[in-house]
C-alpha cells in the first residue's frame, strides 16, 4: 500500500468522524441552554491538553506528513496551527472554530493527487521534537511509526474526552466508514 493510499483515506475518515463527534457534543449543550464553547475546554486529566488542542493536533498531524513526504518545509500556517494547539488552554475557541479547522484540513487532503505522497516512501525524514529529541527514518517508517500513531493518539484523545464527559458516542461513531463494508442482513436488530 502506498503512503498516499494509507494516510489520506485514514485521515479523511477519522476527521469526518471527529466532526460528527463535535456535533454530538454541541447539540445537548445547546438544548440545555449551556454554552457550547465550554466543550472545547474539556479534558481527560489535568495534565492533558483540552479538546480544542486535540482537534488542532489531529488536523496538524493529518497535514504534516503531506509536507514531510514531499520534502517540503512545514508552512507557517501549519506551524501556527500546532502553536494554537499548544496554547489551547488560553484560547480554546469554539466548536465552530474546530469544525472550520477540520473542514480546512479535509479540503487540503481532498486536493491531493492519488499518488501525492508516494515519492516520499524512501525519502530521509528528520523529525525534531520541541524537547530536543530527534528521529531519523525513511518516509515509509515515518508514515507507519510516527504519522499514523500520532494522528490516532489525538483523535482517540478527542473521542475519549467527549465520551468521558457524557457525550453519547459508541463504536459506530468512531468508525462510521466501516458501515460501507457491512454484509447485508448481518446487523443485529433491536
PLM feature spans:
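Mature, function-bearing regions of proteins
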Residues: 1, 75, 80, 84, ...
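Aromatic-rich, lipid-facing transmembrane alpha helices and their immediate juxtamembrane interface loops
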Residues: 24, 35-39, 90-97
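Acidic interhelical loop/turn segments
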Residues: 29-41, 110-143, 175
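Conserved alpha-helical segments that form or flank metal/cofactor-binding pockets of metalloenzymes
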Residues: 48-82
Amino acid at each position: 500500500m502506498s503512503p498516499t493510499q494509507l494516510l489520506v483515506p485514514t485521515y479523511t475518515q477519522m476527521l469526518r468522524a471527529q466532526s460528527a463527534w463535535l456535533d454530538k457534543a454541541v447539540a445537548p449543550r445547546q438544548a440545555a441552554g449551556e454554552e457550547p464553547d465550554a466543550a472545547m475546554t474539556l479534558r481527560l486529566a489535568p495534565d492533558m491538553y483540552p479538546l480544542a488542542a486535540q482537534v488542532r493536533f489531529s488536523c496538524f498531524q493529518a497535514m504534516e506528513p503531506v509536507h514531510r513526504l514531499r520534502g517540503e518545509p512545514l508552512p507557517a500556517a501549519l506551524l501556527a496551527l500546532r502553536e494554537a494547539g499548544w496554547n489551547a488552554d488560553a484560547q480554546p475557541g469554539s466548536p465552530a472554530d474546530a469544525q472550520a479547522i477540520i473542514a480546512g484540513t479535509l479540503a487540503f487532503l481532498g486536493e491531493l493527487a492519488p499518488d501525492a505522497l508516494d515519492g516520499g516512501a524512501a525519502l530521509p525524514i528528520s523529525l525534531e521534537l520541541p524537547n530536543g529529541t530527534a528521529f531519523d527514518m525513511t518516509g515509509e517508517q515515518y508514515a507507519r511509526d510516527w504519522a499514523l500513531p500520532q494522528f490516532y493518539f489525538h483523535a482517540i484523545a478527542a473521542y475519549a474526552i467527549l465520551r468521558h464527559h457524557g457525550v453519547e458516542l459508541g463504536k459506530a461513531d468512531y468508525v462510521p466508514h466501516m458501515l460501507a463494508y457491512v454484509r447485508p442482513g448481518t446487523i443485529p436488530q433491536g
